[in-house]
């Protein structure tokens, strides 16, 4: 089971814990994966204690300056990276990742992302090309390429051979038939 959502105030820790326990009671042999954003270490521990097994949290970008160009000033890459470390310390199977070709991204940023993932040694990695959305400040930016994404996937496989590389819904090449 995957429980996924944004950072929605309706879903308090108590509600999430209740959902986890209900699922575990009915399906005790199934893993529960959460993808619900940045939380406190105490919240992560409570979800784990209730029965959650895995947590997906893209690190987005390791580089502080690049992160600031993509996110509001009240968010920080250091906090997000610490969340991933906390999750691993608790005992979750952890997934991280980033977008390839995001605005302002440099080859150095990609190298830093690779080194961070090598150090974190997550169980799962999800990357995919940046796709601009018309209702965002990045609407006019170029999309990331499939070629660079595949290249980065190859490097990840060489650096972390046993990691689960999760398929991404944006991997369809524009020239493919549907």
Q: PLM features: residue spans?
A:
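Conserved C-terminal portion of the radical SAM core fold
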Residues: 3, 27, 53-54, 59, ...
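Glycine-rich, proline-tolerant flexible connector loops at the mouths of alpha/beta enzymes
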Residues: 2-13, 65-67, 129-141
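Charged helix-capping and loop-helix junction motifs
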Residues: 14-19, 110-114, 144-149
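Radical SAM/AdoMet-radical enzyme domain recognition
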Residues: 1-2, 13-99
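Catalytic cores of alpha/beta
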Residues: 40-49, 102-118, 172-178
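Active-site-adjacent loop and "lid" segments of alpha/beta metabolic enzymes
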Residues: 143-146, 164-177
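Active-site-proximal loop/turn and secondary-structure-junction residues that shape catalytic pockets
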Residues: 7-9, 36-40, 61-63, 100-104, ...
């Amino acid at each position: 089971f995957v429980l996924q959502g944004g950072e929605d105030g309706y879903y308090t820790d108590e509600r999430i814990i209740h959902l986890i326990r209900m699922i575990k009671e009915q399906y005790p042999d199934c893993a529960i994966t959460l993808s619900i954003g940045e939380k406190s270490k105490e919240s992560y521990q409570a979800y784990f204690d209730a029965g959650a097994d895995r947590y997906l949290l893209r690190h987005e970008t390791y580089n502080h300056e690049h992160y600031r160009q993509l996110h509001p000033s009240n968010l920080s890459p250091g906090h997000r990276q610490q969340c991933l470390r906390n999750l691993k310390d608790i005992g979750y199977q952890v997934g991280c990742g980033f977008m390839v070709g995001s605005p302002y991204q440099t080859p150095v940023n990609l190298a830093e992302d690779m080194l961070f993932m090598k150090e974190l040694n997550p169980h799962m990695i999800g990357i995919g090309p940046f796709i601009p959305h018309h209702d965002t400040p990045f609407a006019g930016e170029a999309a990331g390429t499939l070629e660079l994404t595949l290249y980065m996937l190859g490097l990840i496989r060489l650096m972390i051979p046993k990691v689960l590389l999760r398929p991404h819904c944006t991997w369809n090449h524009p020239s493919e038939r549907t």
